[in-house]
């Protein structure tokens, strides 16, 4: 996912991976416990872990595994994610994570989700002319949903975090997923300063 280096999108600030955040494979897996938080984070937690990574990078603070499990349990109870880590309300997950980290400066929000299968001509540079997108020093990032073609550990999908110029910032599987069948969708997020 690359954009023109001279575009407006290339000139916005972007998140830097400045802390060593945990990977989903750092959590122990026990297939005999289908609703075990660690097992579900290990097997299916890539999108969930991407949502947790952004506030950690913005605040330069790393969550402990116990905090991640607490966030998982709270998010399930609140209806923001399902037990299998399917993220339903990413804004709430990110903003609650920021709260756990003591973040009083930033707010995180989804700007748009673009299904690639529904618009094969779309590419990342298309967003640079949208009024709400890059410019004015705003920080943007993408969570990309890749199709893996298997229903194994990652349920046929794998999610990775990219900055606004298309550079991979975080792979929650720590590069253990190697074969992609294409992109399913791209979710664009914006970091706002709280007022």
For each of these PLM feature ranges, what is it?
Residues 1-84:
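Active-site-adjacent structural segments surrounding the nucleophilic cysteine of cysteine proteases
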